[in-house]
A protein has these predicted regions:
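Conserved structural motif at the start of ABC-family nucleotide-binding domains
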Residues: 4-6, 19-21
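Pre-Walker A (P-loop) beta-loop-beta motif of ABC nucleotide-binding domains
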Residues: 22-33
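ABC ATPase nucleotide-binding domain "signature" region
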Residues: 33, 120-128
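The feature captures the beta-strand-to-loop junction immediately N-terminal to the Walker
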Residues: 35-37
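Helix-to-loop junction immediately C-terminal to a conserved catalytic motif
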Residues: 50
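Q-loop/switch helix immediately C-terminal to the Walker
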Residues: 74, 79-95
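Conserved ABC ATPase "signature" region
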Residues: 95-107
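Conserved ABC ATPase signature
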Residues: 111-120
Length: 130
């Protein structure tokens, strides 16, 4: 089953061509790797595929839209408050089993700035999938 299909996909930022004339399909049950130098458009492509940047020539299975999340480079948490409070201020109600699954249960009441880089990334992942 084809999940995504692009046709002559091109993308520019500030009149600079990031990529052009991309034609590809992404099928279910396959693993893909996106590789390239810094600034080559990897994140831009993922933003397009996740729907953050809308493009006319990207076609996707409409059933996917509510199941797609994008975790960018920045965590987007308030450093001075607890992990739990960070989730509360955005209205995300995360059940304890998800915190436990990611090894964050004991850290819910810790200030975000005290978490390790990996714990912060796990927290960001929990936020996008909750």
């Amino acid at each position: 089953m084809i999940l995504y299909k692009t046709s002559d996909l091109s993308y520019e930022i500030d009149s600079r061509t990031i990529f052009s004339n991309l034609d590809f399909e992404i099928a279910s049950n396959e693993i893909y790797e996106i590789r390239g130098d810094n600034g080559s458009g990897k994140s831009s492509l993922l933003k397009i595929l996740s729907g953050l940047n809308k493009m006319d020539n990207v076609y996707y299975d409409e059933n996917l839209e509510s199941n797609i999340a994008y975790l960018g480079h920045k965590n987007g948490f308030v450093e001075e408050i607890s992990l739990r409070d960070n989730f509360n201020i955005i209205g995300a109600h995360v059940n304890d089993s998800l915190f436990k699954k990611f090894g964050l249960s004991k850290l819910k009441n810790h200030k975000f700035f005290n978490l390790s880089f990996g714990e912060k990334r796990k927290s960001a992942l929990v936020r996008v999938i909750s």
